[in-house]
Amino acid sequence: MELELITIEKLAEILKNQYEESLKNEQVVNIHLFGIKYGEIIKKYSYSASKIIELSGLNKSYKTELSKGIRLSKFVKLKNEYSD
């Protein structure tokens, strides 16, 4: 399956929007979900979790949470209501 090219800037924008639109107590889990959803693209294009977090404007400590989601993408498939 061919993975669509999404720029690192676009990924950062998507992450920022997803984070800001989340309920306060679900923001971290939404970072994990983002990593799961876009993990294959992030890995294929060798994008850095640190750079995505930096470009998104989120606290740099969230890099760890994004990295967890990216690693989980190898094992987890999102339910339809969480994917495009």
Question: At which residue positions do the language-model features occur?
Answer:
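Intrinsically disordered, low-complexity and often Lys/Arg-enriched segments
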Residues: 1-2, 82-84
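General nucleic-acid-binding
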Residues: 1-9
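Short, Lys/Arg-enriched anionic-surface-contact patches
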Residues: 11-37
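Flexible coil/turn residues that form the inter-helical turn or adjacent wing/linker of helix-turn-helix
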Residues: 45
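Short alpha-helical "recognition helix" segments of helix-turn-helix
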Residues: 48-55
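Short, solvent-exposed alpha-helical "recognition" segments
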Residues: 62-83
